[in-house]
From Swiss-Prot:
InterPro entries: NAD(P)-bd_dom_sf (IPR036291), Sc_DH/Rdtase_CS (IPR020904), SDR_fam (IPR002347). Gene3D superfamilies: NAD(P)-binding Rossmann-like Domain (3.40.50.720). GO terms for molecular function: D-arabinitol 2-dehydrogenase activity. Belongs to the short-chain dehydrogenases/reductases (SDR) family. It is an enzyme of class 1 (oxidoreductase). Its EC number is 1.1.1.250. One of its GO terms (biological process) is arabitol metabolic process. Coiled coil: none annotated. This is D-arabinitol 2-dehydrogenase [ribulose-forming]. Pfam families: adh_short_C2. NADP(+) binds at L32, N53, Y185, K189, I218, T220.
Amino acid sequence: MDSSSYWSYDNIVPSFRLDGKLVIITGGSGGLSAVVSRALLAKGADIALIDMNLERTQQAARDVLQWGEEQMKGKHESPIGQVSAWSCNIGDAEAVELTFKAINEHHGKVASVLINTAGYAENFPAEEYPAKNAENIMKVNGLGSFYVSQAFARPLIQNNMTGSIILIGSMSGTIVNDPQPQCMYNMSKAGVIHLARSLACEWAKYNIRVNTLSPGYILTPLTRNVISGHTEMKTEWESKIPMKRMAEPKEFVGSILYLASDSASSYTTGHNLVVDGGYECW
C-alpha cells in the first residue's frame, strides 16, 4: 500500500455503517435488544429478531420499523432496512438450525452479524437449587449460546464470508454479585465468556470474530420492575458501582456497534468487553 492510500480518510477512520448486512438478534423482544435494534437499523442493517414469544417479537419488529420511519426520515441516504420476527427456543439445536436457515432464505442473504442477548437469571440458594432448573438455565444460557453461534457460522464458512458474533455475557461470569444466590447463572455466563474465546480461536481462520459483551446492572424494564418500591435494593446495588448508578440500555450501543463493525474491530476477537460502570474494579 502506498503512503497516500495508507493515510486516506477511509483507511484510517473506521466506519460503523452496516449497510446491507443482515443482523440476527436473539432475545429480540427484550429491553436491551429494543435499543440495539434501532441503532443497527439506523446504521443500515437488515434485522431478524428471535424470541420465544412470536407475538411480542412481531410487535418489537413493528416498533423498530415505526421508529425508523419516524426518526430516520431525511437522515438516511439508503432505504430503511427490513426487520423480521421469528419464534425459536435457542436451547433446541434443531429449531435453531431451521430458524437460522429460514432467516437467511427470507432475507435473501447470509447473516453476517449475530448478537445473542437471549438468556435469563434466577435466584436459588445453592443447597436448594432444583436440578431441573439448573439443567434448563445451562441449556438456554450455555448450550443456547453455542447452538446459535454454530448455526450462524456454518453458512459463513460454506460461503467464505466474514462475520461477527457478539455473545452477551455478564459481570457475573467473572465475579460473584453478593448477596444474590445465582450460582448456576454465574456458571453459565462464565461458560459463555470462555465459549467465545474458544470459538474465536477455532474460527479465526475463517475471519469470523467472536467476542463477549458483559454488562453490569442495566435499567431494562425488567430491572426497573424489580427495584420499583425497593429503594434499599437500588441503593445497595449502586453503592457497589464506582460510577454510583446503573446503566441505561443505550449505553451499550457503542460497544455493540464497535464489535459488529468489520472496520472498527477487525483485529478484535476472543475479547470480553466489560461495561459495568467499574463494578469489577473494587
